[in-house]
């Protein structure tokens, strides 16, 4: 679990909030440079990654090739996961995701820029709403 204040020459003011009764399994990686909110009573499976940023932008062609770790962080956007959610093993939750109370994120899903306002099952690559409860 990390709140990143500095990365290379970049400075950040991360806000990382973790509510009560969050159950973390093994090898969970949570990384915040902007805003990451995990509400109460969340079950997080093994090998889950939750991060509000990525390593660099790959949208623009650049003649300069450099190691990914040297690129400035990009794609920065808040993440919020509501109360009583269950995140399955190997799920990846990326920038811009807003998951409401009572949702289940299926194992091996990749959630990016998904905004959900009703309790539901979310799954797939890229993740989408599979079933509303």
Tell where the protein language model's regions lie, with residue ranges:
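Flexible, glycine/small-residue-enriched loop-and-beta-strand segment within the central core
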Residues: 1-93, 125-126, 133
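C-terminal/domain-terminus segments
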Residues: 92-127
